[in-house]
């Protein structure tokens, strides 16, 4: 089965990806892994990607699409794969269709782990870290016994800038704006399956399996 997995930060996409690839024995192909492999193997596209990244620039679609094409042409992806982090735009989605068409196949499904913004905010802004020992807590899922203090050494808990409300909200807004056209694109193609990501992790995977067993 050929799948694309989508979901905003905090939706639990990584957990579902692990379960899907383990149960269905397909490779988990993430954008980061593809770039790292291409650079490690010193491919022409890998060298191009590295030059852009070293300069702090975004890797252009031409290079990204080429790396995706190379990865999906490998033997382990012939019977299926789980794409994660690609495509990010409608243009990339259209190129993915071209790549798969050239390989004589097509996507089976796009799975979107759907979670409301306010729930994502609670998940993403709840992390606190002990200044002394580095132990991590979460206001909802793993709170300290005494607010603001580490259970182990009584150290002060602090919040990283990345976990602060303003930063998280900005990141989510950018992601939501980028993701909507892509969701619309796959919905019009009849490929999109929205999964309620606010359920228990096990129940989310039950819903994912219902989709995957319908092929």
From Swiss-Prot:
Domain of life: Bacteria
GO biological process, one term: AMP salvage
Catalytic activity from the UniProt record: AMP + ATP = 2 ADP
Region of interest: NMP: 30-59
Gene3D superfamilies: P-loop containing nucleotide triphosphate hydrolases
Alphabetic keyword roster: ATP-binding, Cytoplasm, Kinase, Metal-binding, Nucleotide biosynthesis, Nucleotide-binding, Transferase, Zinc
A Gene Ontology molecular function term of the record: ATP binding
CDD domains found in the cross-reference section: ADK (cd01428)
Enzyme class name: transferase
Ligand binding (AMP): 31, 36, 57-59, 85-88, 92, 160, 171
Gene Ontology CC: cytoplasm
Pathway assigned in UniProt: Purine metabolism; AMP biosynthesis via salvage pathway; AMP from ADP: step 1/1
Positions that bind ATP: 10-15, 127, 136-137, 199
Region feature LID, mapped onto this chain: 126-163
Location in or out of the cell: Cytoplasm
InterPro entries: Adenyl_kin_sub, Adenylat/UMP-CMP_kin, Adenylat_kinase_CS, Adenylate_kinase_lid-dom, P-loop_NTPase
Positions of Zn(2+) binding: 130, 133, 150, 153
EC number: 2.7.4.3
Domains (record comment): Consists of three domains, a large central CORE domain and two small peripheral domains, NMPbind and LID, which undergo movements during catalysis. The LID domain closes over the site of phosphoryl transfer upon ATP binding. Assembling and dissambling the active center during each catalytic cycle provides an effective means to prevent ATP hydrolysis. Some bacteria have evolved a zinc-coordinating structure that stabilizes the LID domain.
HAMAP family: Adenylate_kinase_Adk (MF_00235)
Function recorded in the entry: Catalyzes the reversible transfer of the terminal phosphate group between ATP and AMP. Plays an important role in cellular energy homeostasis and in adenine nucleotide metabolism.
Family of this protein: Belongs to the adenylate kinase family.
Quaternary structure (record): Monomer.
Name of the molecule in the record: Adenylate kinase
Species for this entry: Listeria monocytogenes serotype 4a (strain HCC23)
Phylogenetic classification of the source organism: Bacteria, Bacillati, Bacillota, Bacilli, Bacillales
